[in-house]
């Protein structure tokens, strides 16, 4: 097979090695636009896991890399005069130029031809080839030539960074967070060779502008940063090598192959340098592509197999890198954190490293974090917390007004569609009661509608008829009598998403018969097939507001501990907040302040009735749709809601419009809770694809939320909290009839 590889970086050279080694009959040529002896940058980072992957693919390359690498276990975080050191991380640093030289040497020894100063713009420029590999980096000319097929998307991030070196040999992967008159600077530093370290400096655009630095003034940059980091450099110099100020591009492509052309490495995807994964991804791409090509399938089929196998892992790492880069872009919001919590937050910023992962690496640090968090929880709740043993974060108390939860796990509202004219029944008793027995600190009812016309379906729960109070009281009294859990009720009006069938009979489809009229902020149907709502008049607003107040009064009579008002997911109050669903021309439309006017009126009215007990509000922090609510809007919505009388914000996202395109993934909504909690400075609950105790503990210890809300996990396992306690070695006593469970040892089925 004739293979043309465009780009003599780690991706292209390593692929050439693997292809030529596995089949010496392949004719493999590598084209490089620059001179082969040129090189830029300083060191690159590999985890031990990556080194092991490389070792399995080509032991000879791995041996050469290991001999050239510097190794370290520790991470140091310098923040507000404090230094936190974490161990057990196992990294290696290699000089980039050395890496390229050893890869090129290995490739040539196998018979690969490497040609420098050859700019390849189109596949035809390579000459006859059965396979063309575009490994020509972020600014790939081949990718751009075939952009209509690859569908590239480049997201240029906001922070500025410069890649420098230094003669100071850092003994650990070191992060500085350095304030200056211009603003806050972040530094990523690590050793890659004796007496040589990478020194990446990053700052917000406004900080960089205030410093007076210029993009391409290397000498000015070095002089400024040597002065700024004089103490940290300990008399050592900074080194420049094409060290210009840049912004990082996150590269994604709709597809990675077209005909006999395939994207590899940075041409296909990038991951922010804060997770140290660019070269890792490049070399692992090469391993995956070589494996696919070895199958003997026709090239187009092999390329499709490569993309199918490789894309999920890459996209997962890109999500982690996105979380990490957004953390570094927003470090300013964490400046008030305790240095220990700041360090924990930084170490877990990508959402891939959890409380449990970190405990296995560095048990002493996590024990210190847990002890600190337990003390904080005791102070916040006014309840003593035993430190022998120290409880995991999820098993610490939390106070909302006079309500004290015994732990931080919340059963999320989950519609059951089993009520009759709003009356809940035995199904709801078992559903809520079993989760309360299961150990959660707070159980919240399904969306409970404040009027008959406010239901999603005929099977929705209600709080609008006198008889509803007794039906709900039966459940509330059971929870209070038999468990330590508290119970809240979520009050709502479905708005334009009402009068539909249960999801299993047709999601969002109108009823076949018996539809009722709908209300919304504006007369816009949720789907073209849905009923068009009537735009609410002031009289409608009064009636619905009073229905919320009446439902709050009835909830008090039923004995609920907390009310959650539903301002999310495209239901009635949500339609006022989102610009996508609010097209009003009066004082309730237009600016966010105007759009919030009616939801805030409802919050204030419910607060006046509910008086001393806590109120939560569930919001959609973003709409996941162009022109809709963005993350900064979510911060303001939360701030206004708490100012109007809410005590905590249950942070969700989306659901507002049918055309939304959520970016799903593990903990996908937690970053919104994190931002709201620190920028609006309000308590938050986070929800969305949280499944493990490790994730929940991480969220809490890092300060990303105050309570952790789980839905599907509680459907799968009503006793999720008790099983988490067992997993973590924490003793959570069972109710007396179940006390024998303490002596039971579960075994794999």
Question: What is the predicted role of each segment?
Answer:
Residues 1-4, 8-72, 78, 87-98, ...:
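Glycine-rich FAD cofactor-binding loop and adjacent beta-loop-alpha segment at the N-terminus
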Residues 29, 261-263, 443, 708:
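Residue-level marker for buried hydrophobic side chains located in beta-strands
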Residues 135-137, 271-272, 414, 712:
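Glycine-rich, N-terminal phosphate-binding loop of Rossmann-like dinucleotide-binding domains
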Residues 291-382:
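C-terminal helical "tail/cap" subdomain of flavin- and related membrane-associated enzymes
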Residues 105, 128-248, 252-253:
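Conserved FAD-binding catalytic core of PHBH/FMO-like flavoproteins
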Residues 368-749:
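Flavin-dependent oxidoreductase catalytic cores
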Residues 48-163, 365-375:
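Conserved N-terminal helical subregion
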Residues 8-21, 133-134, 244-323, 327:
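Conserved mid-domain beta->alpha element of the FAD-binding
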């Amino acid at each position: 097979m004739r293979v043309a590889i465009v780009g003599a970086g780690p991706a292209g050279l390593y692929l050439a090695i693997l292809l030529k080694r596995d089949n010496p009959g392949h004719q493999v040529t590598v084209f490089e636009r620059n001179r082969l002896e040129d090189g830029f940058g300083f060191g690159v980072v590999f985890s031990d896991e990556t080194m092991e992957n490389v070792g399995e693919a080509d032991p000879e390359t791995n041996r050469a890399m290991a001999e050239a690498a510097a190794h370290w276990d520790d991470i140091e975080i310098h923040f507000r005069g404090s230094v936190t050191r974490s161990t057990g991380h196992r990294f290696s640093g290699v000089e980039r130029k050395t890496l390229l030289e050893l890869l090129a040497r290995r490739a040539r020894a196998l018979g690969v031809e490497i040609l420098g100063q050859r700019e390849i713009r189109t596949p035809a420029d390579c000459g006859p080839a059965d396979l063309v590999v575009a490994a020509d980096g972020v600014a790939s000319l081949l990718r751009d030539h075939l952009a209509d097929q690859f569908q590239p998307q480049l997201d240029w991030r906001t922070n500025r960074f410069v890649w420098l070196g230094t003669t100071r040999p850092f003994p650990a992967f070191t992060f500085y967070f350095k304030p200056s008159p211009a603003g806050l600077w972040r530094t990523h530093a690590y050793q890659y060779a004796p007496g040589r370290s990478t020194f990446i400096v990053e700052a917000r655009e406004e900080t960089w502008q205030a410093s007076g630095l210029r993009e391409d003034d290397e000498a000015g940059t070095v002089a400024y940063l040597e002065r700024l980091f004089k103490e940290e450099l300990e008399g050592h110099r900074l080194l420049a090598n094409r060290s210009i100020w840049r912004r990082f591009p996150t590269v994604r492509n709709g597809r990675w192959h077209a005909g006999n052309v395939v994207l590899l490495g940075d041409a296909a995807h990038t991951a922010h340098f804060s997770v140290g994964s660019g070269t890792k991804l490049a070399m692992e791409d090469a391993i995956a592509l070589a494996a696919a090509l070895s199958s003997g399938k026709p090239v187009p089929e092999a390329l499709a197999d490569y993309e199918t196998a490789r894309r999920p892992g890459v996209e997962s790492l890109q999500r982690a890198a996105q979380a990490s880069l957004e953390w570094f872009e927003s470090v300013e919001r964490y400046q008030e954190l305790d240095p220990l919590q700041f360090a924990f937050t930084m170490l877990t910023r990508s959402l891939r490293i959890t409380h449990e992962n970190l405990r296995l690496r560095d048990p002493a640090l996590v024990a210190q974090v847990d002890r600190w968090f337990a003390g904080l929880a005791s102070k916040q709740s006014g309840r003593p917390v035993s430190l022998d043993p120290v409880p995991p974060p999820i098993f610490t108390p939390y106070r909302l007004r006079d309500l004290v939860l015994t732990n931080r796990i919340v059963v999320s509202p989950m519609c059951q569609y089993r009520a009759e004219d709003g009356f809940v029944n035995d199904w709801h008793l078992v559903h809520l009661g079993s989760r309360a027995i299961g150990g959660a600190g707070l159980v919240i009812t399904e969306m409970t509608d404040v009027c008959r016309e406010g239901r999603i379906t005929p099977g929705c729960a209600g709080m609008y008829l006198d008889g509803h109070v007794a039906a709900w009281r039966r459940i509330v009294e059971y929870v209070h009598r038999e468990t330590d859990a508290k119970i809240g009720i979520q009050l709502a009006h479905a708005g334009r998403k009402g009068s539909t069938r249960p999801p299993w009979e047709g999601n969002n489809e109108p009823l076949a018969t018996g539809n009722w009229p709908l209300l919304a902020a504006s007369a816009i149907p949720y789907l073209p097939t849905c009923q068009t709502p009537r735009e609410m008049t002031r009289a409608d607003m009064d009636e619905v507001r009073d229905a919320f107040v009446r439902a709050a009064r009835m909830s008090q009579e039923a004995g609920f501990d907390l009310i959650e008002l539903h301002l999310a997911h495209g239901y009635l109050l949500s339609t006022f907040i989102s610009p996508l669903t609010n097209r009003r021309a009066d004082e309730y439309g237009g600016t966010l302040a105007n759009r919030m006017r009616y939801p805030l009126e409802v919050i204030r009215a419910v607060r006046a009735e509910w008086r001393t007990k806590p109120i939560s509000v569930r919001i959609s922090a973003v709409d996941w749709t162009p022109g809709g609510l963005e993350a900064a809007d979510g911060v303001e919505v939360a701030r206004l809601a708490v100012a109007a009388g809410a005590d905590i914000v249950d942070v969700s996202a989306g659901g507002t419009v049918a055309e939304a395109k959520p970016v799903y993934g593990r903990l996908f909504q937690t970053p919104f809770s994190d931002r709201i909690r620190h920028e609006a400075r309000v308590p938050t609950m986070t929800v969305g694809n949280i499944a493990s105790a490790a994730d929940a503990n991480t969220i809490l210890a890092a300060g990303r939320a105050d309570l952790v809300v789980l839905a599907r996990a509680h459907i799968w396992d009503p006793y999720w909290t008790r099983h988490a306690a067992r997993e973590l070695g924490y003793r959570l006593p069972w109710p007396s009839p179940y006390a024998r469970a303490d002596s039971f040892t579960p075994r794999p089925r």
